[in-house]
Structures are given as C-alpha cells and as structure tokens.
Design a protein with these regions (language model features):
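AMP-binding/adenylate-forming catalytic core of the ANL superfamily
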Residues: 160, 166-167, 177-179, 330, ...
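Conserved AMP-binding/adenylate-forming
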Residues: 3, 7, 14-32, 100-101, ...
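Conserved AMP-binding/adenylation subdomain of ANL enzymes
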Residues: 263-280, 288-328, 343
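Conserved pre-ATP/AMP-binding loop-to-beta segment of ANL
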Residues: 90-93, 203-205, 221-244, 251, ...
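ANL superfamily adenylate-forming
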Residues: 17-27, 39, 60, 99, ...
C-alpha cells in the first residue's frame, strides 16, 4: 500500500513539474498535501521515527560498500591490506596475549615465514591445511601466512575429539595438519585414520610427541622472512578459510570464506559499530569461529586496531583484563553476557573504558540489566551466520533487537521475512508460486537475496555441495531468483526493528498455540537466577503437539520449584509454561557458548532412561511434582488428563 501511494504521488508531482510553472516550494506543498490526502500520514509518522536512524545507517553502509567494492575491483586480498597497515605502523602493537605484545611487523615476518615454508614444502594455491591450535598469536600468523600464498586454512575447533575432529579435517579435504603443542594428545587419537603430514607448533627445540610430525618452530627459524612472490596471484574471490558451523544439531559444516567475504564481515562490524583504528578490542572468543576470527581479528588485520586475546574465555577475568589493557571495545557471543552477569559484583565491573560491546546472542531479558550493571553505553547486537548473506545490525542500542531494516525504502537492503509452514518449516507460496512476505508482527524465516559474483550478496556455501543446496530457496519473488535461508525465525516491528524468535524446528505447538523455545529459555533462565537452561518440545502419548520441557543446570539443587512456577506464570502464557522440568548437573555447549539440547530432546521425559531429577506440572495441585515411575506410566498411557 505504501509503495502504491508513493508511486501515485510521484507520478502526479512529476506531471505537475512537467506541465506547470509551480515553484519548488509549491510542489513540496502539493506533495505533502497529496500524501496526507491519500492516507500517507502513517508513512510520515514512520519517516519521522525512522529516517534519522536510516540515514545514519545509510552513510555507514556506503562506507562498507565503498571499501568492499574497491577491494574487489582492484582484486585485492586480506594479506595485502594487512601489509599496508604494516607499512604505515610497523611498530604498533597489534596483539596482546598474556605477557606478550606482538607488533604488526612481527606478525608480518612470522606469517611470511609460514608462507614460504608452505611453498618450499610443496603446497600450492587452492590446497587446504587444517589448523588445530589454541588461541594465541601464532594462530593468526599461521593462517595469514597460508593466505599469502593462496593456501586455504580449515580452522578446526580445538574442543573436538575423535569422530568430529576427523570429520572436519576430511570434509575440508586437508592435505596437512598444523597442530598446537597442547593438542598433540587429541591429534594422536585421530592421526592413524587421517594419515596426513603433521606440523607441530610451539615445541621449540623439543621433538613433537606425534609420530613422524615435523617441528614447525625449527622449520620456521630457517624459512625466508620476506613477502612471498605468490601473494600477487591471490585474488578477492579466492578461498581463504573454512570456518565450521557450531554443530548444535549435528556434525559441523565447513563454510567457505573468501577474501571478499572476510572483508565484508569485518568492515560491516567496523563501520556499523562506529569503531576506529584507535580502539583496543577485548576479544576472548575462539579464533576458529567467525565472531572471534573474522569480526574480531579483522579489526586488527584490515583496520589497524589492537586486540587483546586469551587462550579461553574467563567470566571472572573479563572486566579485570579489559580494564588492565585499556580496552575500548568488548566482544561477546552466545551466552557470554549472561555468564558475566552471574559473576559476583566487583569494582572492576565499572572500572573500565569499554564504550561498546558488539556481538550476537544477548537475550532481551538481560539486555538492560547488563548495560546497567557494567555501565555499558552501547550494545551493538548484530545478526548474521558465518556463511550467510542475511546480515543486519542494531547500531542504536534498541533493547532486544538484533538489527533493523528501513521501512520507507524497504528494498534497499535485500533481506526479508517470509512465511513458513509451521509443521514442515518450508516456505509458504502464493497462488503464483512465489514466497509470501511477512507483515510487521508476523514471525517468519529471515532470508537474504543472492546475487552471484557480488561480494556482499553472493552465497559461497559449504564444502559439501548438498548442504549448500539445502540453504537456498528458489523463485522467491520472481521466477529464477534465489535467496539464502537463515534457518532462523525473526519478527519485525512497525519501525523495522528485527527480533530473534527461534530456530526453524525449535518452535513447537502445544494446546493449539505456537511456543518459541528461545523465548521460554530466556524467561526460565532469568527466573532461575540466570542459570543455563534449554527448552524443547517432547511428544506425549495421546496428546496433540509437543509439551514443553525445560532442562535447568543446577548442580547444587538450589532451585525453588514453587517460586519458579510463580514467576513462570507471571512471565509466560499458560500454554508456554514447561510441563516437564529436568534438573541437570551440567550441559554441553559449543565453543561459542551455544547450549546443546539435541540429545536431551531425544531422551524426552523417559523416566526409565533419565537419571536426572524430573518433575511434572500437576494442573490439579498447581505445582511441579516429582515424575515417579508410576506417574510416568500414567502419562505414557494417556491417563494423566492432558
């Protein structure tokens, strides 16, 4: 309706401009009058509330566009951009790690040695090596050196063992493995099956523990420290990295990261979060993941910032170290912000210079609590999958929002919410066979339109071609077009702000209503004292849909179930209150702090299988009661009155 009205007004005003002698002021008056007469006051009201935001975003987006387009036009690459920073500031500190400070020049020299070692050992442009190493400066130097000669690096999660580790190395078609000294035991368990050359980093003059492995430190000491000749052969659309998905629902998938893709990710974060090269970034995230390795490290490599990294995230040390190193920016992902809230209050909570936290995954339920406690002016929440092209950012700190899109010039940013079937998760189609766009307030799957050979909109997919095809929906708005399916359900308000609602497949139906597991998780976690909690639907014999089940990590068994139920009923509709509770000692999480619930979901509420404490919401008694074998049998036989 808005677009039709706008077209009508533009048409009439254009006709008047061409056929009359009205002044510019008169034309403006006619335009406003026409718009109001045709019901455009709502659009004027929307414009008043959103145009300042959209104009600021537009200016920043143009900077992103200019940077990425120029780089691809000149066929540049990430190492070359880094080397330009080396030329300008060779002695500036790039990385701080424990008691070490690495300058741009030191990173450049180390990465040159890696690059020339790869060439001398016979690895060529397009080959892949797997990097299995803990967070440390050598990690970044190693993949940067490989990138200088066109060797692709598969960044392997250092928490993986056995089959998942073997899978990741093999799916990337790795020709060698570079392993950190601390991870040799894990690699020894898989080496016989992998049968690949191994380089071990960090051994110094000590022989590696892995049989037949090469001592990388010794090899680098004699490698050429000058820039490799092969650097000029590396282009913007060459593969640079494989970064693996978190693997919350199965084995990780290897997402293809090209130089242009890496640049877009870090450039988008830099400009939309209004960072500068003077910023010092506290980055405690795993460097094998896109948040830490692309968004975070990209600020160093491309934008000349300084970053503080650590071997593993520590909630107790976060603000202490951020203050110690005068950090101005902090990074988060997943449940990290909640972990920080769970630490005992201390003076360092506010004795820091961090002006903005940027990342993705902070829950709406703790947003304002976090900003208040840690004196945080801005949370720059962004949304975007490692491999995806549906990317947005909340640049003005709207609580709970993961980003926004313009509402007046809606199609400037080619990302949309489309309606999906609640049962199958497949896109719904209109009578012409095309997708249906959601209205404000309607949940839908977030998609981004694909444009081939465009650095901002091309979907490069995964190493597995079948997995790539599953993420593409065809014939979205017209015959032949295509979009990337995020797999996430979002909802948009009237001002264009988008809010994460759930993963497709995580929403379940109970008592004729849709229940968002993500929304219920946020409430359960908060009322349980910010404990780890996951929510999922379980099948109940004789009942339609799936009943909600919440699993709460409470090793001390300190949760008061009576108080919990009171708070749940205050904050949730009746149908969304979990019917079952499971009290856990611990729960598995990914390296990016996403809680795993697939195994729990498969176990359901089976009292004979589960050894943890289980409870059932008895409607007659209005309380959670222990799920005894007898009660389990009654529910399973359909005799519990559900």
């Amino acid at each position: 309706m808005i677009n039709l009205r706008a077209a009508l007004v533009v048409g009439v005003v254009s006709l008047l401009w061409a056929t009359t002698t009205l002044t510019l002021g008169q034309l403006v008056g006619v335009t406003l009058l026409l718009y109001i007469v045709t019901g455009g006051y709502y659009t004027v009201w929307l414009a008043y509330n959103t145009l300042p935001r959209d104009l600021r975003a537009g200016v920043r987006y143009l900077r992103v566009l200019a940077k990425v387009k120029w780089a691809t036009y000149s066929n540049s690459n990430i190492p070359r951009m880094f080397m330009e920073n080396v030329r300008k500031n060779p002695n500036k500190v790039a990385l701080i790690f424990e008691d070490q400070k690495w300058t741009f020049a030191q990173i450049d020299e180390y990465s040159n040695r890696v690059a020339n070692l790869m060439v001398s050992d016979g690895y060529k442009h397009g080959d892949t090596v797997a990097l299995f190493m803990m967070n440390q400066p050598e990690y970044v130097c190693t993949w940067l050196g490989c990138a200088k000669v066109g060797v692709v690096t598969a960044l392997i999660n250092f928490n993986l063992r056995h089959a998942p580790l073997i899978h990741c190395v093999q799916v990337a078609e790795s020709k060698a493995i570079i392993c950190g000294r601390e991870l040799q035991d894990a690699l020894k368990e898989a080496k016989d099956e992998l049968k690949l050359p191994v380089y071990v980093s960090g051994c110094g003059n000590t022989a590696p523990e892995v049989k037949d492995a090469k001592n990388m430190d010794q090899l680098l000491s004699t490698s050429d420290p000058t820039p490799p000749l092969e650097l000029d052969k590396v282009g913007s659309f060459d593969k640079m990295l494989y970064i693996f998905t978190s693997g919350t629902t199965g084995l990780p998938k290897a997402a293809i990261i090209k130089h242009a893709r890496y640049l877009f990710f870090c450039t988008g974060a830099h400009h939309m979060a209004a960072l500068t090269e003077e910023d010092i970034i506290y980055n405690p995230l795993p460097l094998y993941h896109s948040a830490g390795g692309m968004v975070g490290m990209g600020q160093v490599l491309v934008f000349n910032c300084t970053a503080v990294i650590r071997r593993k995230f520590s909630a107790s040390q976060f603000w202490i170290e951020a203050g110690k190193h005068n950090c101005t920016v902090g990074q988060y992902v997943g449940e990290l912000c909640r972990y920080l809230l769970n630490t005992p209050p201390k003076p360092e909570d506010t004795q820091h210079k961090v002006k903005v936290m940027f990342g993705n995954g902070v829950r709406a339920q703790i947003w304002e609590q976090f900003t208040s406690r840690f004196n945080m002016p801005t949370i720059a929440e962004f949304y975007g999958a490692t491999e995806g092209i549906a990317n947005i950012m909340n640049m003005d700190g709207k609580p709970g929002a993961c980003g926004f899109v313009p509402v007046i010039l809606r199609h400037v940013i080619p990302v949309y919410l489309i309606k999906v079937d609640e049962e199958t998760g497949e896109p719904m189609r209109d009578k012409n066979g095309f997708c249906i766009m959601c209205e404000p307030g309607e949940p839908g799957e977030f998609v981004g339109m694909i444009k081939r050979n465009d650095p901002l909109r091309d979907f490069h997919g995964y190493a597995d071609r079948k997995a790539t095809q599953k993420k593409i929906v065809q014939d979205v708005w017209k015959k032949g077009d295509a979009a990337f399916k995020s797999g996430d359900i979002l909802v948009m308000d009237e001002f264009g702000y988008l809010y994460f609602k759930d993963r497709t497949g995580d929403t379940f139906r109970w008592r004729g209503e849709n229940v968002s597991s993500t929304e219920v998780e946020g409430v359960v976690s908060k009322v349980a004292g910010n404990k780890d909690a996951v929510v999922y639907g379980v099948e109940v014999p004789g009942a339609e849909g799936k009943a909600g089940m919440a699993a709460i990590v409470d090793p001390d068994d300190s949760t008061n179930l009576t108080e919990l139920l009171v708070e749940l009923k205050k904050n949730l509709p009746t149908y969304a209150c979990p019917l079952f509770l499971r009290i856990l000692k611990t729960i598995d999480a990914t390296g990016t702090f996403k809680l795993k619930k697939l195994a729990l979901q498969k176990e359901g509420f089976d009292r004979n299988l589960i050894k943890d404490a289980l409870y059932f919401l008895d409607g007659k008694q209005n309380k959670y009661v222990e799920l005894t074998p007898e009660l389990f049998a009654r529910i399973s036989d359909g005799k519990a009155g559900l």
